[in-house]
Amino acid sequence: MMKPLRQQNRPVISYVPRVEPAPPEHAIKMDAFRDVWILRGKYVAFILMGEAFQRSPAFTVPESAQRWANQVRQENEIAE
């Protein structure tokens, strides 16, 4: 008889973006992209949602960060 898998009914923890007031002082704005900033050598997108900024996970390429920003913006337009 096989042992049952442990923790079958474990909740799925989904990624919740942190709400930040604004890109920090040391972030460098990338002119080529609408929402992308360079932060500690990684590319991070910040988008204004209502009164607060939403921050993306850190990406190694700026295109990914911008794609994330576009996607989140689209999702929020649909949600509203």
From Swiss-Prot:
Pfam families: CedA. Transmembrane segments: none annotated. The keyword DNA-binding applies. Signal peptide: none annotated. Disulfide bonds: none annotated. One of its GO terms (biological process) is cell division. One of its GO terms (molecular function) is DNA binding. The keyword Cell cycle applies. It comes from the Bacteria. Keywords: Cell cycle, Cell division, DNA-binding. Belongs to the CedA family. Activates the cell division inhibited by chromosomal DNA over-replication. This is Cell division activator CedA. It comes from Citrobacter koseri (strain ATCC BAA-895 / CDC 4225-83 / SGSC4696). The lineage of its organism: Bacteria, Pseudomonadati, Pseudomonadota, Gammaproteobacteria, Enterobacterales.
